[in-house]
Amino acid sequence: MSYMETYKEWCTNPYFDENTKAELAAIGDDAAEIEDRFYRQLEFGTGGLRGVIGAGTNRMNIYTVRQATQGLANYILSQNGQEKGVAIAHDSRIMSTEFADEAALCLNANGIKAYVFDSLRPTPELSFAVRELGCISGIVITASHNPREYNGYKVYWEDGAQITPPHDKNILAEVAKVTSFDQVKTMKKEDAVAAGLYKVIGKEIDDRYMEELKKQSIHPEVIKEMAKDIKIVYTPLHGTGNLPVRRVLKELGFEQVYVVKEQELPDGNFPTVSYPNPESPKAFEFALKLAKEVDADIVLATDPDADRLGVYCKDTKTGEYVTFTGNMSGMLIAEYILREKKAMGTMPENPALVETIVTTDMAKAIAAAYNVKLIEVLTGFKYIGEQIKFFEQQHTYHYVFGLEESYGCLAGTYARDKDACVAVMMLCEVASWCKKHGKTLWDAMLDMYEKYGYYREGLETKTLKGIDGAAQIQSMMSEYRTNPPKELGGHRVLAVRDYKEDTRKDLVTGEVTKTGLPASNVLYYELSDNAWCCVRPSGTEPKIKYYFGVKGTSLADADAKLAALKEDLLK
């Protein structure tokens, strides 16, 4: 069926509601808009769905959510998981509540129990709930930090991590088989509740999740000692972090927590920030204003589903607030956990630190200093969560900490996804420890640069939208693969890792070895002088991403090297 035929079917078929038909009638004269909405089925990738909210097969709406859920239901039934059920959470975005209910009722119509949170919750709490309730799967309705017009649908498996092989490919195949809405089941909510299939969850899971968060604290006595002295500014950016973040800080004893009023309440329109991403300085505009008013030590922002954390810290020497990348905040927490566990004699046997391949190389230096195994995985926190499962199954290592450059980390194994709630808690504890010793977080970061080396990292993206953009991204990756550069930013290319082909080619010796990681469309260039660069298409947005890192003899030297590498990459 052509895209125009599909458009006409959506406009006339009684299966579709009147609001959907009205929205589509309004674009009847816009051929390009019709094509963009109907030229493909919204792709169910290895993590789930993500797209612009609206009518059409290439949009997030109740029909594409039902279709994806029917595929998931078919797979769950094939695994005899209907009695275990599925936990479902959602964030503050437009249509999130409706999409969560549609997913639940589709599962219910297939005889599968759904445990649905009574209101918005952080993504990591859903990860926790899957394991706590013994569910076979989990769904969270969120588009993370994307702009307001987006929403998404992420799928988790029974270990509490986002789906990984073989389940990701198997679920994807089942979703692809659902080619007609005649195959999609649903039922009325009151019938599902009466049948005991639709179950509401809330406070009891919140309480258990909160207890697990607090268990990750290493020095609660330091927090209590410094509780009156450390000033924290926090913004949930209109998302799910407000209640759990404030609760954990309060229960640990922090007394001076200032929340940005303008961004405190959940709002899927994100009225104060067009891009609710804690990686973006614009997201901190209100928080930094408040920080200056109250003379805060630390400024924190969580994204709408509270799995990523952005950080600013006051540099007392200049009076200015310094931004921390996800690499920097992750390293501060990693160093603190490893140092204090070693000092207290609580480091487990065979400890492991897990990071993604595009995360800072400083992690390798820290792991080596504490005799901790460093394990690298593909981009995506689901692969870090998967490692915890492997450790438990194979009795090899004990997970101590995991992090990725994109502002996500996890202390503890109560959840299997990145958790900004625990990251806030740990970073505030690190800040308390620093203040007790007459330092700031920035001082602690400078100490780490001095100890391990001046590692600096960058990320640049090129956005290429639509059909032409997708083809252009594919063409660029093909060109990088066929004709790899010999030099980047003044650094020689020493080796090329092609994760799609599972090869690492040493350009000096010509030797070819395996990467040992799952197949993924990622190219990684090992450069001279401890520099590196990695390029890959985004899994959730129409972008190609360039990650890069250097090591310098000082901050100025490292930043100059980083600028040269960036300039060369973006030519």
Regions found by a protein language model. Give the residues of each.
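Phosphate-binding and adjacent anionic-ligand microenvironments
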Residues: 292, 296-298, 320-322, 340-536, ...
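Short Gly/Thr/Asp-enriched flexible loops that form oxyanion-binding sites at enzyme active sites
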Residues: 99-107, 150-157, 307-327, 363
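An N-terminal, well-structured beta->alpha segment
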Residues: 5-103, 192-228, 240
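Conserved phosphate/anionic-ligand binding catalytic regions in large, soluble enzymes, centered on
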Residues: 38-58, 143-146, 232, 236-248, ...
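Gly/Ser/Thr-enriched, mixed-charge loops and adjacent short helices
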Residues: 11, 30-38, 42, 151-285, ...
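N-terminal small/polar loop signature for handling phosphorylated ligands or for N-terminal nucleophile
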Residues: 87-150, 250, 255-311
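Glycine-rich phosphate-binding loop plus the immediately following alpha-helix
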Residues: 156-186, 327-350, 355-364, 420
